[in-house]
C-alpha cells in the first residue's frame, strides 16, 4: 500500500481520482434516496420516473463535482479526517442542496424531500468513506507494527503522540495504552485504554511486552517529573521524553528524544537576567581563554547571543579552536548569529607571558573569561610541575596582563576541588584564587572567580567514560561505592558564569548552587538502564578504589568564607578574604625556585599544599 501512495502517478492524479470517487458516492446516494422514497418498489411508473431523472443526472453530477472541488474536499488527507474536513463536506452538500432545490422548484422534476434526503446521504457516505479508509489504514499499520509502546500521560501530549505514531511510519510502534493518575484509570483515549497509574509502569510493561515508553507529561512539578523519570528508567526499557522547542517560525514544536542523564539530575531552572549580562557584553570586545574546551566553547556559544562587537577565542588546541570557529561561520551563513560579530581565533599558550601581554595590548578586550586550565586529577598528581606552570603561573600571566593593560572585567573559572584540596589540581586552583584576591584593583578592574563542581559531558569526565564502557559491553568502573559529586550541565554552568560576571566587583569568589550531590554508583546504574540494560545482569558495576588525591565528597566553600545571596537564587558570593599580596608573591617565587631546582613530585606537592593553608 505504501508503494502505491508514493508512486508518481498517484501523486499526480490524486485530486482527480478522489473527485471521481466522490462523484460516484454522490450518484450512489441519489439512487439510494430515490429507492427509499419509493419504498424500494419498482413498477412501470417508477421506471418512467427513473428515465426522467436520468435526464438531469449529468447536471447533478457536474454540479457536485464543481462544488466539492471548490470546497477542496479532494485536497484533504483521508488519514487525517477531522473537524475541518467534516465542515467542508457539510457545506458542499448544503450548497448543492440549495442549488438543486432552486432548479427543482423551476422544473418540478422531483421533490425537495428527495433532494434533502439525497444530500444527507451524500454527507454521510462521503464522510463514511473517509472514516472507513482511516480505520483500514490504522488496521494495516497495527499489523505491520509488532513493537508495543506505552504512553505516560493521557492528556493533550499523549493524544498528539498517539496520532503521530499512527500517521507516521517512522514510529514502528503499536500503542497498547496509556498511564496516568488514578482518576483516569479505566477511561479511554482515542480507542486506547488508560491501563493504570504511573506507579504501575513496571508491572504493565512486563504484562504487555512493552518495548518503548513515551513520556508526554510536561505540566508537573520538577519533583513529580523526577519521580516519573525514575519509575520509567527503572524498567530498563528504552524511554523517550517529549520536548517543546521554538522553531524558526516562532511557533512551538514537539519532538521526542531519548532520556539523557541530565534529565535524571533534577536540576533547577535558571532565571537569567539577560539585561544585566547584556550590559557588560553587548558591543564589547570579549576574550575567552581555553575557548576550545568544554566550558570555554560553551561560554563562546552563549556570549554570541549578547552581540559583542568582537569575540577573541584563545587556546593552545588548534583543532578544537578551528572547529569552534567553523561552527560559528556556519551559524553566520544560516543567519543564526549577528553577522557583524568579528571572530578571532588565536593559538596562544597562557604560559607565554609576553604573548598574553601582546594579546591584551593589541586587542584591548573589555571582558576576559579565563577558562584555560589543566583539570584531570590523576594526570596532575603524576605531573605536579605541569599543573603548577599552567594553572598557577599561566593564570598569573593572564591576571597580571589584565591589571596592567586596563581590562575592565576579569572572570576566572574555578572548581569545588579548590575547597580544602587533597590533590594537586585543586591546590593549584586554590592558589589562583588567592593570587586573584591579593591583587590591587584600584585601577578599576572588576575581578571574580566562579567556583562549581563537575559538568556533565565535559571532555574526559565520568559521563562519556561510562557511555564508552557501556557501549563496549564491559564493566562500568566506579572508584568507590559511596563517592558523591556535584553535577550541572555545561550550558547551565556557562550561563551562570555569565550571570556571575555581572556581579563581579572586587575579587569575589562566587559559588554556584549545584543542587544535591549525586552518588556516582547510582549514576552508573541509571546510565546502564538508559541503555536498555540491567545492572548486574547485562553489565556489572565494579568498584576499583579511590585514585591518588581523590576525595569521597566535594565541598563548595571553606568554613571561614562567609556566604551571601545574590539576586539570583543559584549564585552565592563569598566575601573576599584579606590576603597579603607580598606574601602570595613570595610563595610563588619560592615555588618557582623549587621547580627549577628539583623534579621531586612529593616535595613539590608538599610545598604547594603548605602554601595554600589559610
Describe each model-derived feature in a short phrase:
Residues 1-145, 173, 234, 241:
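Signature of alpha-helical transmembrane segments in polytopic membrane proteins
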Residues 7, 14, 271, 276-280, ...:
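Strand-loop microenvironment adjacent to phosphate/nucleotide-handling motifs in alpha/beta enzyme folds
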Residues 27, 133-240, 316-325, 330, ...:
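A solvent-exposed beta-alpha-beta segment
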Residues 225-287, 403:
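Flexible, Lys/Arg-rich cytosolic regulatory linkers and terminal tails that connect or flank
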Residues 226-240, 310-317, 361-362, 382-409:
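NAD(P)-cofactor binding segment of oxidoreductase domains
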Residues 249-251, 370, 376-377, 382-433:
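Conserved Rossmann-fold NAD(P)-dependent oxidoreductase catalytic core, especially the SDR/UDP-sugar
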Residues 286-302:
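N-terminal Rossmann NAD(P)H-binding glycine-rich loop of SDR-like oxidoreductase domains
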Residues 347-366:
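Conserved Rossmann-fold cofactor-binding substructure of NAD(P)-dependent oxidoreductases
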Amino acid at each position: 500500500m505504501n508503494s502505491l501512495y508514493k508512486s508518481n502517478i498517484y501523486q499526480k492524479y490524486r485530486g482527480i481520482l478522489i473527485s471521481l470517487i466522490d462523484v460516484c458516492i454522490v450518484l450512489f446516494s441519489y439512487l439510494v434516496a430515490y429507492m427509499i422514497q419509493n419504498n424500494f418498489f419498482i413498477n412501470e411508473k417508477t421506471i418512467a420516473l427513473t428515465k426522467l431523472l436520468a435526464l438531469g443526472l449529468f447536471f447533478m453530477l457536474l454540479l457536485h463535482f464543481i462544488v466539492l472541488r471548490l470546497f477542496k474536499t479532494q485536497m484533504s488527507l483521508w488519514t487525517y479526517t477531522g473537524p475541518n474536513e467534516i465542515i467542508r463536506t457539510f457545506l458542499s452538500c448544503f450548497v448543492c442542496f440549495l442549488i438543486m432545490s432552486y432548479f427543482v422548484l423551476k422544473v418540478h422534476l422531483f421533490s425537495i424531500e428527495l433532494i434533502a434526503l439525497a444530500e444527507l446521504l451524500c454527507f454521510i457516505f462521503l464522510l463514511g468513506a473517509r472514516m472507513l479508509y482511516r480505520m483500514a489504514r490504522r488496521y494495516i499499520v497495527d499489523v505491520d507494527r509488532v513493537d508495543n509502546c506505552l504512553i505516560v500521560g493521557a492528556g493533550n501530549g499523549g493524544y498528539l503522540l498517539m496520532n503521530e505514531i499512527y500517521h507516521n511510519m517512522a514510529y514502528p510502534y503499536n500503542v497498547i495504552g496509556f498511564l496516568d493518575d488514578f482518576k483516569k484509570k479505566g477511561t479511554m483515549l482515542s480507542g486506547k485504554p488508560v491501563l493504570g497509574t504511573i506507579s504501575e509502569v513496571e508491572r504493565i510493561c512486563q504484562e504487555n511486552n512493552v518495548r518503548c515508553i513515551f513520556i508526554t507529561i510536561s505540566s508537573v512539578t520538577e519533583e513529580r517529573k523526577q519521580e516519573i523519570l525514575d519509575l520509567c528508567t527503572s524498567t530498563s526499557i528504552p524511554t523517550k521524553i517529549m520536548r517543546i522547542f521554538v522553531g524558526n517560525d516562532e511557533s512551538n514544536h514537539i519532538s521526542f528524544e531519548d532520556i539523557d542523564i541530565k534529565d535524571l539530575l533534577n536540576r533547577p531552572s535558571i532565571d537569567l537576567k539577560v539585561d544585566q549580562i547584556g550590559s557588560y557584553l553587548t558591543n564589547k570586545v570579549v576574550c575567552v581563554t581555553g575557548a576550545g574546551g568544554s566550558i570555554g566553547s560553551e561560554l563562546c556559544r552563549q556570549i554570541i547571543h549578547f552581540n559583542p562587537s568582537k569575540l577573541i577565542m584563545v587556546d593552545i588546541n588548534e583543532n578544537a579552536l578551528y572547529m569552534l570557529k567553523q561552527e560559528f561561520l556556519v551559524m553566520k551563513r544560516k543567519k543564526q548569529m549577528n553577522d557583524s560579530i568579528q571572530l578571532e581565533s588565536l593559538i596562544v599558550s597562557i604560559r607565554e607571558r609576553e604573548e598574553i601581554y601582546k594579546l591584551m595590548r593589541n586587542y584591548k578586550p573589555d571582558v576576559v573569561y579565563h577558562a584555560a586550565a589543566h583539570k584531570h586529577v590523576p594526570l596532575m598528581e603524576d605531573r605536579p610541575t605541569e599543573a603548577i606552570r599552567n594553572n598557577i603561573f599561566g593564570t598569573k600571566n593572564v591576571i597580571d596582563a589584565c591589571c596592567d593593560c586596563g581590562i575592565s572585567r576579569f572572570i576566572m573559572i574555578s572548581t569545588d576541588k579548590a575547597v580544602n584540596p587533597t590533590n594537586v589540581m585543586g591546590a593549584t586552583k586554590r592558589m589562583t584564587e588567592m593570587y586573584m584576591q591579593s591583587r590591587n584593583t584600584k585601577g578599576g578592574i572588576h575581578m571574580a572567580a566562579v567556583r562549581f563542581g563537575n559538568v556533565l559531558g565535559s571532555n574526559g569526565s565520568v559521563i562519556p567514560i561510562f557511555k564508552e564502557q557501556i557501549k563496549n559491553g564491559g564493566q562500568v568502573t566506579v572508584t568507590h561505592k559511596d563517592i558523591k559529586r556535584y553535577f550541572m550541565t555545561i550550558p547551565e554552568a556557562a550561563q551562570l558564569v555569565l550571570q556571575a560576571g555581572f556581579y563581579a566587583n572586587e575579587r569575589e569568589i562566587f559559588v554556584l548552587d549545584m543542587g544535591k550531590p549525586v552518588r556516582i554508583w547510582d549514576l552508573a546504574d541509571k546510565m546502564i538502564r538508559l541503555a536498555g540494560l540491567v545492572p548486574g545482569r547485562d553489565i556489572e558495576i565494579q568498584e576499583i578504589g579511590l585514585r591518588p588525591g581523590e576525595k569521597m565528597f566535594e565541598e563548595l566553600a571553606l568554613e571561614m568564607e562567609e556566604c551571601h545571596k545574590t539576586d539570583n537564587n543559584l549564585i552565592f558570593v563569598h566575601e573576599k578574604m584579606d590576603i597579603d599580596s607580598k606574601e602570595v608573591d613570595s610563595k610563588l617565587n619560592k615555588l618557582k625556585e623549587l621547580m627549577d631546582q628539583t623534579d621531586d613530585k612529593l616535595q613539590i606537592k608538599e610545598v604547594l599544599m603548605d602554601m595554600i593553608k589559610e
